[in-house]
Amino acid sequence: MQNLIVAVVAYLIGSVSFAVIVSAAMGLDDPRSYGSGNPGATNVLRSGNKKAAILTLIGDAFKGWLPVWFVVHYGARYGLDETSVAIASVAVFLGHLYPVFFRFKGGKGVATAAGVLLAINPILGVATLLTWLIVAFFTRYSSLAALAAAVFAPIFDGFLFGPHVIALAIVVMSSLLVWRHRGNIAKLMRGQESRIGDKKKADAAAKPAGGSDV
């Protein structure tokens, strides 16, 4: 019963779309209506409002971090264990990808996954974030950076902690993240992927194929 509650609460937290909320609060267009159509920080950046993009990034990462951190640090007193941490991790991630509050049309999950990993273990989270930053810095492709981070996150986890139940949750999240970027993979192969900082007007024509969004 406890794990069911964890799953529901984490999923509902994940379903809060900060890209949509921040954009509405700041009088910006709905991020689902321009660029890649993805409600994520990278697409919000295409509006030209860096503050909105940063707030979206922080919000999406925080919502991934919050439920997992709570279970990690306070779960034992409620009869929760590592399985509960794994459930919270996947549930909050699924909430971002398929939010009940926004007709199950969510983002790609990179920032939320980063928050989850930081809550599981700060070293794991920082190592994965550095992977994203390095690839993004040299290529300016958010999608390629996300794919690299998704591949290396389970590797970092295995190297640091060995086999454990939470590793399965990390593999599931990484697999879902790669799946959500399948359109980006195709665009990268065609040389048509948009780069970080591209404006929404320049990118609008590419919307049906998916964007390179966090």
From Swiss-Prot:
InterPro entries (UniProt xref): G3P_acylTferase_PlsY
Positions of transmembrane segments: 4-24, 52-72, 82-102, 118-138, 159-179
GO CC terms, sorted: plasma membrane
One Pfam family per UniProt: G3P_acyltransf
Keywords from the named record: Cell inner membrane, Cell membrane, Lipid biosynthesis, Lipid metabolism, Membrane, Phospholipid biosynthesis, Phospholipid metabolism, Transferase, Transmembrane, Transmembrane helix
Annotated compartments: Cell inner membrane
Disulphide bond pairs: none
Reaction it catalyzes: an acyl phosphate + sn-glycerol 3-phosphate = a 1-acyl-sn-glycero-3-phosphate + phosphate
Domain of life of the organism encoding this protein: Bacteria
Protein EC: 2.3.1.275
Molecular function GO terms recorded: acyl-phosphate glycerol-3-phosphate acyltransferase activity
A biological process from GO: phospholipid biosynthetic process
Topology in membrane: Multi-pass membrane protein
Pathway named in the protein's UniProt entry: Lipid metabolism; phospholipid metabolism
Role description: Catalyzes the transfer of an acyl group from acyl-phosphate (acyl-PO(4)) to glycerol-3-phosphate (G3P) to form lysophosphatidic acid (LPA). This enzyme utilizes acyl-phosphate as fatty acyl donor, but not acyl-CoA or acyl-ACP.
Quaternary structure (record): Probably interacts with PlsX.
HAMAP family reported for this sequence: PlsY (MF_01043)
Family as reported in the entry's similarity comment: Belongs to the PlsY family.
Descriptive protein name: Glycerol-3-phosphate acyltransferase
